[in-house]
Amino acid sequence: MLCFVRSDSDILESSWLNRAAASLASNSDGSAPFIHSELLFCPPEGQHGTETVSGLACSIVYSGQVHLESKKFSRKEWFFRSMECSKGQYDTMMNFCQEHRGNGFNHMGYFLYWSPLRPSPTSYNWLGMSSRWYCSEIVIAALKSGSILDDTVPSS
């Protein structure tokens, strides 16, 4: 399941970074843009109430590390997109997230997202460093690893 939060959500910190992300990601319809995403692995027996959705979430926040942790999402603050996948695809995406847990934040890629010269998550590997991501990059890469998205989809 894909999870998104809008820039005007009460769960976000009031910071220059979130304001900048919101201004760069503005929507043509005037609604607050989505500025954060997470990939939620919901087991069939997952607990989905009328107010929350829970499972294992994979993402990263600014200056943080890729996480894969149990999380509960409020339906009031988050927007969800369900998707179907096979057990093999689910396992492949889960393994991808486990393999990248602890990777750092892609600061240069985040601030140069508009540039054709921005570093990709794996650009750092040739320097002997682990991959670096921002939230949409790790979510898209996980979906690509499970063949939910194909390689024609941009990485962010």
What are these regions (language model features)?
Residues 3-87, 122-127:
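Glycine-rich catalytic cores of cysteine/serine-nucleophile enzymes that process amide/ester linkages
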Residues 117-156:
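Activation targets extended, charge/polar-rich intrinsically disordered C-terminal tails
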Residues 6, 41, 100, 142-145:
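Short alpha-helical scaffold segments that flank and stabilize functional sites
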Residues 68-81, 89-96, 146, 150-152, ...:
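Short alpha-helical interface patches
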Residues 48, 103-108, 145-153:
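Substrate-binding/catalytic groove segments of enzymes
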Residues 84-119:
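A structural motif
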